[in-house]
Amino acid sequence: MKDGFIKVAAATPEIKVADCKHNAKQIISLAKELAKKDVKLAVFPELCITGYTCQDLFYQTTLLDGAKNALITILEELSAFDMITVVGLPMQYDSKLYNCAAVTYHGKVLGYVPKQYLPNYNEFYEMRHFTAWDGSKCEYFLNWFDTDADGECDDSLSAYFGAGLIFCCNNMHDFSFGIELCEDLWSPCPPSTYLAQEGANIILNLSASNEMIGKSEYRRSLVLNQSARLISGYIYCSAGEGESTQDLVFSGHNIIAENGATLAESELFSNDYVISEIDVNKLAFERRKNTSFRNDKCDTETIWFDIPLTDTKITRFVSRTPFIPYSADETDKRCELILSMQAHGLKKRLAHTYAKTAVIGISGGLDSTLALLVCANAMKLLGRPMTDIVAVTMPCFGTTKRTKSNAVKICEAIGVTLREIDITDSVKQHFLDIGHDINDLSVVFENGQARERTKVLMNIANQTGGLVIGTGDLSELALGWATYNGDHMSMYGVNCSIPKTLIKHLVSYYSKTTDNKLLKESLEDILDTPVSPELLPAHNGEISQKTEDLVGPYELHDFFLYNGIRWGFTPEKVFRLALYAFDGAYDRETILKWLKTFYRRFFSQQFKRSCLPDGPKVGSVTLSPRGDWRMPSDACATLWLSQIENLK
């Protein structure tokens, strides 16, 4: 449970219709197995104690008493485990029968939740046996279940009864859940909506959804969409083997979802359980940011419980490259969309400013290459010739033959206007003017070149009536790896929300899909070139200054950026996730070293982001001071850095 990870399970026992003792035994056996796996919240199907398909047997007092006694057995057998277990059973209340979920923990019932929407169409006849809960105020239940099998008072069965119950952990308030049952989710106004608005971060759904062609896909979409709309975890547990097959078949379809993403899903007819960890801290963070997620003051009752906080072993998938989709097909679709968004953003800016040209500095590196490709796409959208793109290569002290050659080849392949302006003499003169020793390879030596290049581009833009197109990316902005008023500045930055790890995929996708052989070959060579600003002199014609040797691997920094900024995780949690995701790739000391670098630079370099040029947002993480990220330039990093120091 540390860092907000709650290990949860959806489990489908093999039942026998109307055999409550057998069903209780199956539930207990599965629950004990889940408890050994450190599960803290286990959900079983709708009416699993009796079976969903009992039909008119639900009227029988014998069955209802059997369900009650089975619940008592479950309470007794699971009382020693630090795991909340939620089971389904029929309950009589005020002379009416309700289809209910019972929430059990440490030998007591915490609450009973009745079903609100009863299907009574096609194959369903629930209204024949059950009454729909009218949504009225929750009441403390002291009637039918207030005595045990011997007629003695049994306080363990007394609990609140009603649909508006929210169960919340005393020692971790983000661990809170509400319950709906099967058809409740399929209704126009699912109860989970108001439960989430009242603070439930996880929704449980005890279900008995029969299988038929196409239904599993629809069911999955309902669960995922509801979890996304509610910014919640969603545990869906459906009935399976053992239910009557007189007219229907049940597949035991179990799903654990989180904010629109599937964490775990069972195969149909597997009759098993699925386990994953729902990150309630992540959900709480997202809700804090979302101003549309408001409390509507519904009539609910909070049921508090205490559960020991332990380290949860992470088993859910944690991507090393969170900005990149899991599948190759999805990555290609994402790349196509991003390239289109970038091009349309630039198209609008060029048209609005009546710019005659798009001026761009070309180095032969990934960032400027992507920006050039975006310029080409924008010109296509505008129906203008590629010669309206003025690409400028500006070799100086650190330029290598490889990068210069690639820059020229790309420009020739696309057909842009190419200008080569060697800035060596200009920079040397500038050093003479300010009295800087050319052999002093300090930050003055590096930044002087970057600012000279920007000056050249700005003046050419004025000369040609154009706009300077920025090439800097999101990863560089996060680290402040840009020269202030040098490559930091442009008139429109097309890469401003593209992280370095994604840029490689965008260029690779362009290479795969282009019919231009020369362009394809050049792009492939650029993809193999080390990332470098090329501001220090080359060594034997090879790049001597490799960015990742200086600031750290970009795959680590992009991981830190996504988890630390997108989800607001603490450095401690980011570190824990990095250790898990990069196991075998980087050791603890390496990850910790670059994590400290990330936070130190992220805070100290905000002043560069505070005056960022315009550029299109394409993903969920962006650092524009006018949009998603507003931070004072003089904020202190002490809290974050001190937490990192404590990790050593």
Spans of features found by a protein language model:
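Enzyme catalytic cores with a strong preference for nitrogen-chemistry domains
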Residues: 1-359, 377-386, 418
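ATP/NTP-dependent adenylation/nucleotidyl-transfer catalytic domains that generate, transfer
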Residues: 173-175, 232, 244, 258, ...
